[in-house]
C-alpha cells in the first residue's frame, strides 16, 4: 500500500499535517522499543529545497515529530548523508538547514563517509558487486528513506528517468566519487537496495522537479521502495515498466508491485500537475553542453572536473 497526500498550503503546519496524513494512511506505527533511528534525506548538492533538488528539512522535522508522538521519544535519531563528487555532507547540512533542524529537535547529523564500514557482496544479473558500506546503516533499528520527487540526471552516457526511493539509497555509498558506478548504474542501484532495506519511505514532493521546479505539495509514503517508486514514476508521467532500474528491481524481487493499492489523492489529478520533461531534448542539451566544455578545455588548457571527464557522448 502506498499513500498519496497533498497540501494546498506550504507553511510548516500544512506540511506537518500532510506528512502525518500520509503516514496514518499506511498505518505506520514504529515499535515502541526501538533505540536507534536513521533518516536518509536526499542532499545531493548545495541547492536548497526551493529548487526541487534536495529534501525539505521541514518534511524531516515532521517525521521526527510523528515518531516522538508515537511514543518513541527516547530513541536516538540520526540524520545521515554521504559525501558526493561535488558535495561535502558537513557543508550541505549547514547550508540546507539541517544544522538548525538538528539543534531544534536534538538529533545528530552523521556523515556516512566518516562512518565505520563493512564489506558486502551481492550479485545482480550475474554481475558481482562488492560494496564498502556504512556499518550504522545495518545496525539501526529503523531506517527511514526521505527522497525527492524529481526526474533523474544524465549519468554514464544514459538519461536516468527518475531519482526517488531506490536511487536515494544509492547515496548511502560512502565514497565520494560514485561516478565509477555509472557504467552499471541500474544494476548498482538495485544491488544496493538488495543489501539495504529501509523500513519506511516518505517522498518529498512538496516542491518537485520535472522540466522545472513546481510547488506540487505532494507526500508519497510506503514501506516498499519499489512500490513507492512505481507510483512516483506515474506521477512524473512514466510507465514504471519502461524504467530500467525499476524493471530490474522487479526481476530481482527487490520489493513488489503486485496488488499495489494507492490510498489518498487521485493519482491522475496529481499527474496532470507535474511538468514532464522531454528526455530526448534533455539528453541533446546535456550532450551539447558537455561538448562545448570539452572544446573549451582543449583550447584553453583548462581541465574538466573528473566527474565530467568520465562521461561518454
What are these regions (language model features)?
Residues 1-313:
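N-terminal and secondary-structure boundary signal
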Amino acid at each position: 500500500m502506498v499513500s498519496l497526500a497533498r497540501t494546498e498550503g506550504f507553511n510548516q503546519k500544512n506540511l506537518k499535517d500532510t506528512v502525518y496524513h500520509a503516514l496514518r494512511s499506511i498505518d505506520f506505527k514504529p515499535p515502541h522499543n526501538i533505540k536507534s533511528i536513521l533518516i536518509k534525506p536526499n542532499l545531493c548538492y548545495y541547492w536548497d529545497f526551493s529548487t526541487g533538488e534536495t529534501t525539505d528539512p521541514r518534511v524531516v522535522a515532521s517525521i521526527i515529530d510523528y515518531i516522538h508522538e508515537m511514543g518513541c521519544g527516547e530513541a536516538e535519531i540520526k540524520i545521515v548523508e554521504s559525501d558526493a563528487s561535488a558535495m561535502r555532507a558537513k557543508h550541505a547540512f549547514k547550508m540546507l538547514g539541517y544544522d538548525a533542524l538538528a539543534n531544534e529537535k536534538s538529533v545528530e547529523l552523521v556523515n556516512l563517509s566518516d562512518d565505520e564500514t563493512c564489506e558486502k557482496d551481492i550479485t545482480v544479473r550475474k554481475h558481482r558487486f562488492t560494496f564498502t558500506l556504512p556499518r550504522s546503516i545495518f545496525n539501526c533499528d529503523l531506517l527511514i528513506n526521505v527522497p525527492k520527487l524529481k526526474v533523474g540526471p544524465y549519468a554514464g552516457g544514459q538519461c536516468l528517468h527518475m531519482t526517488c526511493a531506490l536511487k536515494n539509497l544509492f547515496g548511502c555509498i560512502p565514497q565520494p566519487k560514485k561516478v565509477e558506478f555509472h557504467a552499471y548504474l541500474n544494476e548498482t542501484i538495485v544491488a544496493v537496495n538488495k543489501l539495504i532495506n529501509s523500513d519506511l519511505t516518505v517522498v518529498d514532493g512538496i516542491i518537485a522537479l520535472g522540466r522545472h521546479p513546481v510547488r506540487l505539495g505532494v507526500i508519497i509514503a510506503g514501506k516498499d521502495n519499489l512500490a513507492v517508486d512505481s507510483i512516483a514514476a506515474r506521477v512524473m508521467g512514466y510507465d514504471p515498466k519502461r524504467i530500467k532500474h525499476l524493471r530490474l528491481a522487479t526481476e530481482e524481487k527487490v520489493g513488489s508491485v503486485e496488488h499495489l493499492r494507492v490510498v489518498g489523492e487521485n493519482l491522475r489529478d496529481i499527474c496532470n500537475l507535474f511538468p514532464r520533461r522531454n528526455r530526448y531534448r534533455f539528453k541533446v542539451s546535456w550532450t551539447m553542453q558537455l561538448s562545448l566544455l570539452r572544446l573549451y578545455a582543449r583550447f584553453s588548457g583548462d581541465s574538466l572536473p573528473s566527474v565530467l571527464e568520465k562521461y561518454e557522448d
